[in-house]
């Protein structure tokens, strides 16, 4: 089973293109890993997955387009501004502006207001901001990790390279012709690379 931790505004159904059974992890309690489970975290979910992996081992994990938490007053202010907008602003305007952020490179995912609790979205922006959560202790993570970034997502390519250099058991894949939303921009390449990682014995059990 692929245990997914989606990014902000992510839905469990976003992962229906995967050829494996999958289920979304609750963000708060750390999941107990079964012997064949793979943890997959995207963007904000990737940062939360790293927190889980500091204390819970999985057979393998996949981190996609994730940043690294670090104190940042300006980022905290930006996330607070977004949180306030998510509490009350017109949804269509909000989605237009959210998807227009340079990090997404023009790739738009359709999102319907009825699928969300606005108060919960605002809470996530405040509580899971990379400016609020503690920096990950990557050196502590023993789970084998495949870290993925899109080649057009320069900031997150740099983060991925630095993270993989610190992780004890990790490999890096830069996805061609993709930006931040790798799984949905290049789904076939994404699935192919995940399959190779899941089936490989590059990191045998210790």
Q: PLM features: residue spans?
A:
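Flexible "cap/lid" loop of the alpha/beta hydrolase fold
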Residues: 54, 59-87
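Hydrophobic, aromatic-rich cap/lid helix
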Residues: 109-137
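Conserved HGGG/HGGXW glycine-rich cap/lid loop of the alpha/beta-hydrolase fold
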Residues: 1-29
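Catalytic histidine-centered segment of alpha/beta-hydrolase-like enzymes
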Residues: 178-191
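Catalytic histidine neighborhood in serine/cysteine hydrolases
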Residues: 165-181
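Short beta-strand/loop motif that positions the catalytic acidic residue
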Residues: 141, 147-149
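Gly/Ala-rich beta-loop-alpha elbow adjacent to hydrolase catalytic centers
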Residues: 41-45, 49
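Conserved alpha/beta-hydrolase "acid-adjacent" motif
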Residues: 154-160
